Amino acid sequence: MPNFRILGMFTGIIEKIGTITDVIQSGSNLQFWVNSPLSDELKIDQSVSHNGVCLTIEEIKDGSHRVTAIQETLQKTNLGAWEKGTLVNLERCLPFHGRIDGHLVQGHTDVTAVCLEIEDKSGSWVFQFQYPSEFAQLLIEKGSVCINGTSLTVFDLTANTFKVAIIPYTYNNTNIHTVSPGDRVNIEFDMMGKYFARMMELRSKD
């Protein structure tokens, strides 16, 4: 039989927060040790979303697991800024029988966005982010976007900025509470939007 691998999918619903306990330079790659409540439940070669980036579990030891980010990943995401103590959003792959409580996420970061402003609404928070305008066709008002692995809803959309509203549960149970103005977050746009944009691009060339 041919040797193939079914790629994992995620939903943008964070299961646990992990903590970076060690960062190891390995050639052009970075290896990260992550301590988390999920680590002992994982398996070697399992795909797990870390801040929205699909990484492969390489080693598990004493309530922690190790993953590697290659140079391309470090260039396209915020993983290069991780250090000891950094909090990381974790989500295991969606099982075939599972519910899609967020939206379908591949674990492939498209671009990073910069946090511009945080408004405290006395019970919720509104975060504004700036992203490269060439991706504007991939966002719609009230559409889905994945920020550091978390499925959120877009509003107040412009050509290069958007806002998301954060409820207390999300604020306390993801690493969004660690984001400050000026910080970069990983962005994955909605998969269906990307396929539609690609289809329209190809049609325009006919």
Where in the sequence are the language-model features?
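Conserved loop->alpha-helix
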Residues: F4-D206
